[in-house]
Amino acid sequence: MNKVLYALLTLAAFTSCANSFNIQGTSNVSSLDGRKLYLKTAQGDSLVNLDSCDVVHGQFAFHGTIDSVEVAQVFMDDVNLQFPVVIEKGDITVRLDNTQQRVSGTPLNEKLNDFWTKFTQLRNQYAEIDHEESAAILNGHDEETVNAQLIKKALGVYAKGDKLFTKFVTENFDNILGPWCFMTRITYDTTPNAYPVWMNDYMYANAINQLPSWVEYIMTKATDSFKQNPQVKAFYADFLQAQKEMNGTAEPAAEAVPAAGTTPDAVAAPPTPAQMAGDSISR
């Protein structure tokens, strides 16, 4: 009996080790020192703490075990630091700075870091366009003419984002990053007042108009495992219902588009272009 019990305990310990994650973090943001950080993931419409820690002299760490690979976010109290991390077994390294954020150490986190860096660069371009508009108006240029020219520039940034999302989702259909990126774009594109005021109405309408065809394109290309992801499956069912309602072929049902910040795994809407001019994780 003792031998059987010992064997079971050994197996349990081995399994726990095999599914454990270890996140070592550093930060040079002075306002984070002494603060408590939380690693949170979404379960349904709720956020669940995976672990928490204090930042001490710019150092922090998260540890735990997982049943399956998922995407989590780092919070300072209730403030989402807009820093996604893939929770998978292995040693993960994160760096939180005002100017740069990086996650590395495991295969999926390397992929995520590459995508998030490019996505952040595109978001910054909206802020740059906003600054360009303000400078032009201050210099006496006609506001309507300036805005018309810069809207075209903003649409070019949106087109680059469309290609970035499409490429990343299709390259990651069969791991957690595909569904996560798919739902992240939906959350981002359906967030009202996401752009600087002078371009918001036009850019938001453009995003909403483009989204249905993008969703259909992704779903026609998607693998079975992607389609069976619970979040994707639930969203797409609501999306199809909403499309039928718009065409007058179905009774009204739940809205297809989730509210910003409620999308599973995305956890919260990414920082919007309207926030980027002074955006920093120290706020």
What is the meaning of each model-derived region?
Residues 154-170, 174:
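Extended amphipathic alpha-helical interaction segments
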Residues 170-173, 177-283:
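Charged, long alpha-helical assembly modules
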